[in-house]
């Protein structure tokens, strides 16, 4: 008996810093991580502090729509 919506979903986290628009950096792009979250425990958008290889520092990564 499967439910309509799964409790655990795979989400994508994207760097909120403007990595792609920094012209002084050597690498251009946007840092993205994939992870899972439980919809019952965290119904809101997830925000985690992760390492961005394009900024070379820890920045806030927010959940994005698929």
Curated annotation (Swiss-Prot):
Designated name of the protein: Large ribosomal subunit protein bL33c
Keyword Calcium appears in the UniProt entry: no
Keyword Plastid among record annotations: yes
Annotated coiled-coil segments of the chain: none
Source domain of life: Eukaryota
Keywords: Chloroplast, Plastid, Ribonucleoprotein, Ribosomal protein
One Pfam family cited in the UniProt record for this chain: Ribosomal_L33
Gene Ontology CC, one term: ribosome
Cell compartment(s), UniProt: Plastid, Chloroplast
Organism: Physcomitrium patens (Spreading-leaved earth moss)
Sequence similarity: Belongs to the bacterial ribosomal protein bL33 family.
């Amino acid at each position: 008996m499967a439910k309509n919506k799964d409790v655990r979903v795979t989400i994508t986290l994207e760097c909120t810093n403007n990595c792609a628009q920094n012209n002084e950096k050597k690498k251009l792009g946007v840092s993205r991580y994939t992870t899972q979250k439980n919809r019952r425990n965290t119904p809101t958008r997830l925000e985690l502090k992760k390492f961005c290889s394009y900024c070379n520092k820890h920045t806030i990564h927010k959940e994005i729509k698929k």
